[in-house]
Curated annotation (Swiss-Prot):
Gene for this chain: MDM10
Cited InterPro entries: Mdm10
Organism superkingdom: Eukaryota
UniProt domain comment: Lacks alpha-helical transmembrane segments, suggesting that it resides in the membrane via beta-sheet conformations similar to those predicted for other outer membrane proteins and porin.
Function description: Component of the ERMES/MDM complex, which serves as a molecular tether to connect the endoplasmic reticulum and mitochondria. Components of this complex are involved in the control of mitochondrial shape and protein biogenesis and may function in phospholipid exchange. MDM10 is involved in the late assembly steps of the general translocase of the mitochondrial outer membrane (TOM complex). Functions in the TOM40-specific route of the assembly of outer membrane beta-barrel proteins, including the association of TOM40 with the receptor TOM22 and small TOM proteins.
Keywords recorded for this protein, A-Z: Membrane, Mitochondrion, Mitochondrion outer membrane, Transmembrane, Transmembrane beta strand
Family assignment from sequence similarity: Belongs to the MDM10 family.
A single BP term in Gene Ontology: establishment of mitochondrion localization
Protein topology in the membrane: Multi-pass membrane protein
GO cellular component, one term: ERMES complex
Positions of disulphide bridges: none
Protein name as annotated: Mitochondrial distribution and morphology protein 10
Quaternary structure (record): Component of the ER-mitochondria encounter structure (ERMES) or MDM complex, composed of MMM1, MDM10, MDM12 and MDM34. Associates with the mitochondrial outer membrane sorting assembly machinery SAM(core) complex.
Length: 465
């Protein structure tokens, strides 16, 4: 479940027309959300409040190892943020759950721009650790982000600086961190057809190519990776499909994933990992099932039927729908001359309207009239996306498994009487007394039980006003 402060941050990006989906950091977010979702490992309680239109705060309490907690505070000068940030009772569940990313090509930036900022701070106790973030929009396509992690115990503090650029063609990130003087550069380029092809099947696809390069100045250790993402929709059903391919040449790791949304409430994902140096591989599967209330489903069905009835209703007030050509003579006027041969010139003159050009001007009039009875037809992609947005989901069940780890991850997230509840567990065949990291030789020596046993379990409860 997305925490309240993270939810406010994403709404801030949405208000300021900043698209986080088109960044290299989130290029594999769809498969990560379906396979590597976070499972609570303790009892966690979060209470959040919007004290003023520009300030938000959260109090967190958990029993992870010992009783600990945190206090968060967020301030922003964005005037419209209080209108779109909703409490836990009214917020749609899709906005608080990391799920499938439905990317749409041809995005545009906002017409108006105003430099806005966001301040965030979080104090952890009893460790006395301070986490802070400062975000400042510089231009309509760039922003500056400063993150820091400070400790009162005298340990070294970490300061990270981001310069980010977000444009319709892609994104760029320049990162510098005081931790080992790390310097990095990330970019993502979108190869989409553009807005001129939105009506065609090719206009619903997006191909993104990106890479990242890192260098530790203090130890001169390099790092790099590249990734490819292809997002498209089925031409007959409009179901979104996402394929990714990533490569880390230094470590020899290759990863590919395939994700598809079969219906508004069903998603499936598979991922294959392979290492060219160690010849090790792994196959992972994940799925999620969304549940909607019966009343919401019935309301959406009734609205769809009503819209169809209104669209197919024929406006009788328009004379074009009567099928007659204006200016043409009536049948009673030409009845006496009906027996004339068709090759007689008088026959054609009587059949013509009063104006010789009237029939030519209106020859196409009866043909488009049936089409005018219906509104412009939406594509199957737009219909599928509208169906997802109109559905009011109440809960979601996530499951993932890995052949190499031989585990089963379960997570249930939903709304219950104004509370956002997230409960999950990880079941594995590794004994509890075994170390968390074991190689293949040690894994063969450690006996594995026949049945899965819980390795992690937790519940998270969030409430916001």
């Amino acid at each position: 479940m997305i925490e309240y402060m993270e939810y406010v941050l994403r709404q801030f990006e949405r208000t300021t027309s900043w698209d986080r989906d088109y960044s290299y950091e989130n290029i594999t977010a769809t498969s990560d959300n379906l396979l590597q979702f976070e499972i609570p490992d303790s009892l966690n309680l979060q209470i959040s409040n919007q004290s003023t239109p520009n300030t938000f705060n959260t109090f967190e309490l958990s029993n992870r190892s010992i009783i600990n907690g945190s206090l968060s505070y967020l301030y922003t000068d964005c005037g419209q943020l209080d209108k779109i940030v909703q409490n836990s009772l009214k917020v749609p569940l899709q906005q608080r759950v990391d799920t499938y990313q439905c990317l749409r090509p041809g995005r545009t930036l906002g017409t108006s721009f105003r430099s806005q900022m966001l301040l965030y701070g979080r104090m952890y106790w009893p460790g006395s650790i301070l986490e802070a973030m400062y975000c400042k929009r510089l231009t309509p396509q760039s922003q500056l982000v400063l993150k820091s992690l400070l400790s009162a115990a005298g340990e070294s503090s970490i300061l990270t600086l981001y310069w980010q650029r977000n444009a319709p063609w892609g994104s760029q990130d320049i990162v510098f961190s005081t931790n080992e003087l790390l310097l990095g550069y990330r970019f993502l380029h979108n190869l989409s057809p553009g807005r001129s092809h939105e009506g065609s099947p090719h206009g619903q696809s997006t191909l993104s190519l990106g890479a990242e390069f890192w260098l530790g100045i203090s130890n001169l250790l390099p790092g790099c990776s590249t990734a490819l993402r292809y997002c498209t929709h089925a031409t007959n059903t409009g179901k979104p499909i996402t394929l990714t391919l990533s490569l880390n040449p230094l470590f020899g790791h290759i990863s590919s994933s395939y994700s598809v949304k079969f219906s508004p409430g069903t998603t499936f994902c598979s991922k294959y990992d392979f290492n060219v140096y160690s010849i090790e591989s792994n196959l992972s599967f994940g799925c999620e099932f969304w549940k909607s209330s019966a009343a919401a489903h019935k309301q959406a069905t009734n609205e769809e039927e009503t819209s169809i009835e209104v669209a197919t209703e024929t406006p009788v007030s328009d004379p074009r729908y009567c099928g007659a050509v204006p200016g043409a003579r009536s049948f009673d006027q030409i009845r006496p001359f009906a027996e004339l041969p068709s090759d007689n010139q008088l026959y054609h003159q009587l059949m013509m309207p009063n104006s010789s050009n009237a029939l030519i001007d209106n020859v196409n009039l009866p043909f488009p009239s049936p089409l005018l009875r219906y509104p412009p037809e939406k594509s199957v992609t737009d219909k599928f996306a509208a169906m997802i947005d109109a559905t009011q989901f109440t809960s979601v069940l996530k499951m993932s498994s890995s052949l190499r780890d031989k585990n089963l991850r379960l997570l249930w997230e939903g709304k219950y009487k104004g509370f956002l509840v997230s409960a999950g567990a990880e079941l594995t065949t590794i004994p509890l007394e075994a170390p968390k990291t074991i190689n293949e030789i040690t894994a063969q020596q450690v006996p594995r039980p026949l049945w899965l046993r819980p390795a992690k379990f937790g519940i998270q409860i969030q409430y916001s006003t």
